[in-house]
Amino acid sequence: MTRLVVATRNKGKLREIAAILDGLPFTLLSLEDFPDFPEVEEDGKTFEENALKKASVAANITGLPALADDSGLVVDALDGKPGVYSARYSGENASDEANNAKLLSELESVPYEERTAAFRCTIALCSPGGKRYTFSGELHGVILDSPRGTGGFGYDPLFFVSEKGATMAELPLEAKNAVSHRGRALALLKDHLGWQGIE
Protein backbone atom coordinates (compact mmCIF):
# COMPACT_ATOMS: atom_id res chain seq x y z
CA MET A 1 0.00 0.00 0.00
CA THR A 2 1.33 3.45 -0.94
CA ARG A 3 2.35 5.68 1.94
CA LEU A 4 1.11 9.27 1.91
CA VAL A 5 2.43 11.91 4.31
CA VAL A 6 -0.09 14.34 5.76
CA ALA A 7 2.04 17.36 6.63
CA THR A 8 0.47 18.20 9.98
CA ARG A 9 0.86 17.56 13.68
CA ASN A 10 -2.73 18.69 14.35
CA LYS A 11 -4.59 15.57 15.52
CA GLY A 12 -8.04 17.06 14.80
CA LYS A 13 -7.08 17.89 11.24
CA LEU A 14 -5.50 14.46 10.73
CA ARG A 15 -8.66 12.74 12.02
CA GLU A 16 -10.83 14.67 9.53
CA ILE A 17 -8.49 13.91 6.62
CA ALA A 18 -8.27 10.20 7.49
CA ALA A 19 -12.07 9.92 7.73
CA ILE A 20 -12.61 11.46 4.29
CA LEU A 21 -9.81 9.55 2.53
CA ASP A 22 -10.92 6.26 4.10
CA GLY A 23 -11.28 3.55 1.48
CA LEU A 24 -8.37 4.67 -0.70
CA PRO A 25 -5.34 2.36 -0.93
CA PHE A 26 -3.02 4.60 1.06
CA THR A 27 -1.40 4.35 4.46
CA LEU A 28 -1.48 7.81 5.99
CA LEU A 29 1.52 9.06 7.96
CA SER A 30 1.69 12.35 9.83
CA LEU A 31 4.62 14.52 10.85
CA GLU A 32 4.47 12.71 14.21
CA ASP A 33 5.97 9.75 12.29
CA PHE A 34 8.99 11.93 11.45
CA PRO A 35 10.18 13.30 14.82
CA ASP A 36 13.09 15.25 13.31
CA PHE A 37 10.92 16.99 10.71
CA PRO A 38 11.65 20.73 10.86
CA GLU A 39 8.99 23.37 11.43
CA VAL A 40 7.93 24.88 8.09
CA GLU A 41 7.33 28.61 8.28
CA GLU A 42 3.94 29.56 6.87
CA ASP A 43 4.97 32.84 5.29
CA GLY A 44 2.76 32.76 2.20
CA LYS A 45 0.21 35.46 1.53
CA THR A 46 -2.46 32.93 0.48
CA PHE A 47 -3.73 29.57 1.70
CA GLU A 48 -2.51 28.02 -1.58
CA GLU A 49 1.07 29.31 -1.15
CA ASN A 50 1.27 27.92 2.39
CA ALA A 51 -0.24 24.54 1.47
CA LEU A 52 2.11 24.09 -1.50
CA LYS A 53 5.13 25.02 0.58
CA LYS A 54 4.29 22.56 3.38
CA ALA A 55 3.47 19.70 0.98
CA SER A 56 6.54 20.17 -1.22
CA VAL A 57 8.90 20.40 1.78
CA ALA A 58 7.33 17.23 3.25
CA ALA A 59 7.64 15.36 -0.06
CA ASN A 60 11.27 16.41 -0.50
CA ILE A 61 12.34 15.56 3.06
CA THR A 62 10.49 12.24 3.38
CA GLY A 63 10.86 11.07 -0.23
CA LEU A 64 7.13 10.22 -0.15
CA PRO A 65 4.11 11.90 -1.71
CA ALA A 66 2.69 14.46 0.70
CA LEU A 67 -0.41 16.50 1.19
CA ALA A 68 -0.85 19.61 3.26
CA ASP A 69 -3.68 21.96 3.87
CA ASP A 70 -3.81 25.56 4.78
CA SER A 71 -7.11 26.84 5.89
CA GLY A 72 -8.61 29.57 7.89
CA LEU A 73 -11.44 31.85 8.72
CA VAL A 74 -12.22 34.91 6.63
CA VAL A 75 -14.55 37.38 8.37
CA ASP A 76 -16.20 40.01 6.19
CA ALA A 77 -16.55 42.66 8.93
CA LEU A 78 -12.80 42.33 9.64
CA ASP A 79 -11.75 42.78 6.00
CA GLY A 80 -10.86 39.11 5.64
CA LYS A 81 -9.05 38.63 8.95
CA PRO A 82 -7.83 36.42 10.48
CA GLY A 83 -7.18 34.76 7.06
CA VAL A 84 -3.79 33.05 6.74
CA TYR A 85 -3.08 34.05 10.35
CA SER A 86 -6.08 32.10 11.72
CA ALA A 87 -4.02 29.64 13.80
CA ARG A 88 -1.88 32.39 15.30
CA TYR A 89 -4.42 35.23 15.38
CA SER A 90 -3.75 36.12 19.01
CA GLY A 91 -0.02 35.34 18.81
CA GLU A 92 2.44 32.57 17.96
CA ASN A 93 1.46 29.19 19.45
CA ALA A 94 -1.89 30.66 20.52
CA SER A 95 -4.56 28.31 21.82
CA ASP A 96 -7.94 27.91 20.12
CA GLU A 97 -9.51 29.58 23.15
CA ALA A 98 -7.22 32.62 22.87
CA ASN A 99 -7.90 32.99 19.14
CA ASN A 100 -11.65 32.68 19.70
CA ALA A 101 -11.52 35.27 22.50
CA LYS A 102 -9.68 37.74 20.25
CA LEU A 103 -12.19 37.19 17.44
CA LEU A 104 -15.15 37.75 19.78
CA SER A 105 -13.51 40.88 21.17
CA GLU A 106 -13.02 42.33 17.69
CA LEU A 107 -16.62 41.55 16.71
CA GLU A 108 -18.14 42.76 19.98
CA SER A 109 -19.95 45.76 18.46
CA VAL A 110 -20.77 44.09 15.13
CA PRO A 111 -24.44 43.10 14.72
CA TYR A 112 -25.34 39.48 13.93
CA GLU A 113 -26.33 40.16 10.31
CA GLU A 114 -22.87 41.63 9.62
CA ARG A 115 -20.92 38.73 11.16
CA THR A 116 -20.77 36.79 7.90
CA ALA A 117 -17.69 34.69 7.35
CA ALA A 118 -16.26 31.82 5.37
CA PHE A 119 -13.98 28.94 6.20
CA ARG A 120 -11.56 28.45 3.28
CA CYS A 121 -9.23 25.54 2.66
CA THR A 122 -6.64 24.70 0.04
CA ILE A 123 -5.13 21.21 -0.05
CA ALA A 124 -1.86 20.69 -1.90
CA LEU A 125 -0.61 17.30 -3.09
CA CYS A 126 3.06 17.07 -4.05
CA SER A 127 5.19 14.17 -5.21
CA PRO A 128 8.93 13.86 -4.54
CA GLY A 129 9.37 14.17 -8.32
CA GLY A 130 7.90 17.67 -8.31
CA LYS A 131 4.28 17.17 -9.42
CA ARG A 132 1.95 19.62 -7.66
CA TYR A 133 -1.84 19.79 -7.45
CA THR A 134 -4.19 21.98 -5.43
CA PHE A 135 -7.84 21.54 -4.42
CA SER A 136 -9.97 24.19 -2.70
CA GLY A 137 -13.19 24.32 -0.70
CA GLU A 138 -15.23 26.97 1.07
CA LEU A 139 -18.09 27.09 3.57
CA HIS A 140 -20.14 30.18 4.42
CA GLY A 141 -21.57 30.92 7.85
CA VAL A 142 -21.98 33.46 10.62
CA ILE A 143 -19.85 34.09 13.72
CA LEU A 144 -21.89 33.75 16.93
CA ASP A 145 -21.29 35.89 20.01
CA SER A 146 -20.47 32.88 22.22
CA PRO A 147 -19.17 29.34 21.61
CA ARG A 148 -21.50 26.36 21.16
CA GLY A 149 -20.53 22.69 20.99
CA THR A 150 -17.54 20.64 22.07
CA GLY A 151 -16.51 18.90 18.84
CA GLY A 152 -14.06 20.04 16.22
CA PHE A 153 -11.26 22.52 16.86
CA GLY A 154 -10.23 26.07 16.07
CA TYR A 155 -13.11 28.43 15.38
CA ASP A 156 -15.67 25.60 15.04
CA PRO A 157 -17.62 26.53 18.23
CA LEU A 158 -18.26 30.06 16.89
CA PHE A 159 -18.99 29.24 13.24
CA PHE A 160 -22.74 28.79 12.70
CA VAL A 161 -23.91 27.03 9.53
CA SER A 162 -27.46 28.20 8.84
CA GLU A 163 -28.53 25.25 6.69
CA LYS A 164 -27.50 22.86 9.47
CA GLY A 165 -28.86 25.00 12.32
CA ALA A 166 -25.68 24.28 14.27
CA THR A 167 -22.11 25.37 14.78
CA MET A 168 -19.36 23.24 13.28
CA ALA A 169 -18.52 22.11 16.84
CA GLU A 170 -22.08 20.80 17.32
CA LEU A 171 -22.03 18.60 14.21
CA PRO A 172 -20.96 14.94 14.36
CA LEU A 173 -17.70 14.36 12.44
CA GLU A 174 -19.42 12.70 9.47
CA ALA A 175 -21.92 15.57 9.10
CA LYS A 176 -19.14 18.14 9.51
CA ASN A 177 -16.98 16.48 6.86
CA ALA A 178 -19.92 16.44 4.43
CA VAL A 179 -20.24 20.25 4.48
CA SER A 180 -16.90 21.63 5.66
CA HIS A 181 -14.42 23.61 3.60
CA ARG A 182 -11.81 20.91 4.25
CA GLY A 183 -14.31 18.17 3.41
CA ARG A 184 -15.09 19.83 0.07
CA ALA A 185 -11.40 20.23 -0.82
CA LEU A 186 -10.64 16.66 0.28
CA ALA A 187 -13.53 15.31 -1.81
CA LEU A 188 -11.85 16.83 -4.88
CA LEU A 189 -8.50 15.36 -3.79
CA LYS A 190 -10.09 11.95 -3.18
CA ASP A 191 -11.64 12.02 -6.65
CA HIS A 192 -8.24 12.90 -8.14
CA LEU A 193 -6.47 10.12 -6.21
CA GLY A 194 -9.16 7.61 -7.17
CA TRP A 195 -8.72 8.37 -10.87
CA GLN A 196 -5.05 9.31 -11.22
CA GLY A 197 -3.31 8.16 -8.07
CA ILE A 198 -0.43 10.21 -6.80
CA GLU A 199 1.58 10.49 -9.97
Swiss-Prot record:
Substrate binds at residues 8-13, 71, 153-156, 176, 181-182. The active site is at residue 70. Homodimer. GO terms for molecular function: dITP diphosphatase activity; ITP diphosphatase activity; metal ion binding; nucleoside triphosphate diphosphatase activity; nucleotide binding; ribonucleoside triphosphate phosphatase activity; XTP diphosphatase activity. Signal peptide: none annotated. Keywords: Hydrolase, Magnesium, Metal-binding, Nucleotide metabolism, Nucleotide-binding. It is an enzyme of class 3 (hydrolase). GO terms for biological process: nucleoside triphosphate catabolic process; nucleotide metabolic process; purine nucleoside triphosphate catabolic process. It comes from the Bacteria. Its cofactor is Mg(2+). This is dITP/XTP pyrophosphatase. Its EC number is 3.6.1.66. Pyrophosphatase that catalyzes the hydrolysis of nucleoside triphosphates to their monophosphate derivatives, with a high preference for the non-canonical purine nucleotides XTP (xanthosine triphosphate), dITP (deoxyinosine triphosphate) and ITP. Seems to function as a house-cleaning enzyme that removes non-canonical purine nucleotides from the nucleotide pool, thus preventing their incorporation into DNA/RNA and avoiding chromosomal lesions. Belongs to the HAM1 NTPase family. It holds the Pfam family Ham1p_like.
